[in-house]
Amino acid sequence: MITFVKKELTMLDSLKKIAIGSDHAGYKYKEYLKKYLQSQQFTITDFGTDSEESIDYPDPVHPLARAVDNQDFDKGIIICGSGNGVAIVANKYKMVRAAVCWNEEITMLARQHNDANIIALPARFISPEQALSFLQIFLTTDFEGGRHLRRVEKISQTL
């Protein structure tokens, strides 16, 4: 088991601009997380969806991932039923490293070892409280660099 120290999530952190989006399955979680982040004075841009009416998950994820890829945002949050669909779409973009996070250790390692810049949450498999906990870990865990930097740089290389 890896242990970690949860840092305080404040505006003193270098993160300020967060992109968030979901499909219908993740809508309630998106709204819950958005409300929390706004209460912490983060600047949030919501890429949709705006209801629980069924939509195709690539529709909100493509513009969100493109914006993270262009470094318009510090981090991104995407949510669908499994987390997989939204992560697959986001990872089409060269500088995006979207990680499906379903527990604290996976979330921490996604940041420490993979420098994930988008968290993908599986709304059908975690509670809203777990989603918030994972998001706090995601936003406060630093990338370790070192040997991991070399590996992360290889991710964005064109094949």
Locate each region found by the language model.
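C-terminal binding/interaction regions
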Residues: 21, 104-159
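Short, high-confidence coil segments that cap the C-terminus of an alpha-helix
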Residues: 15, 72-74, 115
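Short, Lys/Arg-enriched N-terminal segments with co-localized hydrophobic residues
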Residues: 1-10
